Amino acid sequence: MIGAVLAGGKSRRFGEDKLLFEINGKPLVLHTIERLEGCSSIKKVIIVASPQNREAMEEFGYEVVVDDLTIGPISGVYSALSLGDAFVVGGDMPSLIPEFIDYIIKQFNNSGKIACVPRWSNGYLEPLHAAYSKNFRDILEERIEKGLYKLGDAISSAKNVCYIKIEDLPLGWRESFFNVNKKEDLHRIMQ
Ligand SMILES: Nc1nc2c(ncn2[C@@H]2O[C@H](COP(=O)(O)OP(=O)(O)OP(=O)(O)O)[C@@H](O)[C@H]2O)c(=O)[nH]1
Ligand SMILES: [Mg+2]
């Protein structure tokens, strides 16, 4: 399974490219990648960049896929799946828990479903902490062509998805969903 790191966002709330912002002397995206590399079921990490930050992302030495659409996470996942099945995360998720990710990938492999996505009991999904089959790409393509850009809606529209009930999991695993959106979010990781 590929670990795909979405890195083609606009960082509007953060004010500068948050993925290159150094935390304890290391760019945010590398903190995220380090966590992904700790997953025993992830064999290779790729970065899904925008045309704008492609060069900066290539500096890190990982395979880079360019997302030419950059219409949000949906085109990031679409681009990632061109390389095969992938576990997809945002590059702004430095608190990923490898054990949790391995758990989802195991459920994905056992289920034979098109995707395996954590879901809260209120129906809210965590699509940037989920496993996707390369076959899900066709569904995304159809949605994108129709101008339907919400990744969560694309998942909900698919019939063969396996959902993981978050409330049934260890409480500590919820930390894995933490993502940096604003400068003040950094307090939570810079102790
Ligand atoms: N490849 C790709 N990645 C994206 C795209 N949009 C968002 N991402 C990434 O997905 C993750 C979560 O997105 P957001 O938190 O909304 O990030 P953002 O768009 O950079 O930030 P805001 O402008 O503040 O919403 C981040 O790591 C982004 O870099 C996109 O269009 N393409
Ligand atoms: Mg975010």
From Swiss-Prot:
EC number: 2.7.7.77
Family annotation (Gene3D superfamilies): Spore Coat Polysaccharide Biosynthesis Protein SpsA, Chain A (3.90.550.10)
Claim: Zinc is one of the keywords in the record: no
Obligatory cofactor(s): Mg(2+)
Main location: cytoplasm
Reaction(s) catalysed (UniProt annotation): Mo-molybdopterin + GTP + H(+) = Mo-molybdopterin guanine dinucleotide + diphosphate
InterPro entries: MobA-like_NTP_Trfase, Molybde_CF_guanTrfase, Nucleotide-diphossugar_trans
GO CC, alphabetical: cytoplasm
Gene Ontology molecular functions: GTP binding; metal ion binding; molybdenum cofactor guanylyltransferase activity
Keyword vocabulary terms for this entry: Cytoplasm, GTP-binding, Magnesium, Metal-binding, Molybdenum cofactor biosynthesis, Nucleotide-binding, Transferase
Annotated GO biological process: Mo-molybdopterin cofactor biosynthetic process
CDD domains: MobA
Places the protein is found: Cytoplasm
Residues annotated for Mg(2+) binding in this entry: 92
Binding site for GTP: 6-8, 18, 67, 92
Broadest EC class assigned to this enzyme: transferase
Pfam families: NTP_transf_3
PANTHER family to which the protein is assigned, alphabetical: MOLYBDENUM COFACTOR GUANYLYLTRANSFERASE
UniProt domain comment: The N-terminal domain determines nucleotide recognition and specific binding, while the C-terminal domain determines the specific binding to the target protein.
Name this polypeptide is given: Probable molybdenum cofactor guanylyltransferase
Gene: mobA
